[in-house]
Each structure stands twice: as structure tokens, then as C-alpha cells.
């Protein structure tokens, strides 16, 4: 069972043919997402990074990777200059 956290990619993610146990829409802080899912069992989390408040600040992604099992997270990146830059992707 999978979890979807969506914002800008909501329409694309809603078309996936997967089992979903929880779906969260909107913008949340990294701390809110960690608190929401740290004791929640799921196979994979599909995370639209635009759902993370101030996602351009890499420390917010680091908070999520430290607070949740990063091996279970699939990131959906927007097609913009910042998130597709090599410096952003290398961090």
C-alpha cells in the first residue's frame, strides 16, 4: 500500500494505477510531513516536492530524509529551473 503527497502534480498522481492507503493534498512543512508519517506503515511514498513548504531550501528535503525511511520515498520533481539544476539534484 502506498501514500501520495501531492500539490502541483495532483492530477498526474491521481491517474496512477496503484493501491493507495492515504493521500494528502496541499502544502505542508517538512516537520508536519515527518510527524504525519513517522509512525505510519506504507510500502512507498510518492512525494510531490511542491507539497513541501519552501522546497527550494534543500534542508527541508534533508529533514524528510532523516525523519522518514528515504528508501521508501519516490520524489516527483517539477520541471523548473531550480529543481532540475545539477547543483540542486546533486545535494
Residue ranges and their predicted role:
Residues 1-90:
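Long, basic/Gly/Ser/Thr-rich N-terminal segments
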Amino acid at each position: 500500500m502506498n501514500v501520495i503527497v501531492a500539490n502541483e502534480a495532483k492530477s498526474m498522481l491521481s491517474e496512477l494505477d496503484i493501491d493507495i492507503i492515504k493521500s494528502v493534498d496541499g502544502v505542508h512543512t517538512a516537520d508536519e510531513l515527518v510527524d504525519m508519517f513517522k509512525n505510519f506503515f506504507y510500502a512507498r511514498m510518492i512525494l510531490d516536492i511542491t507539497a513541501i513548504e519552501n522546497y527550494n531550501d534543500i534542508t527541508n528535503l534533508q529533514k524528510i530524509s532523516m525523519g522518514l525511511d528515504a528508501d521508501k520515498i519516490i520524489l516527483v520533481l517539477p520541471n523548473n529551473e531550480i529543481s532540475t539544476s545539477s547543483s540542486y539534484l546533486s545535494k
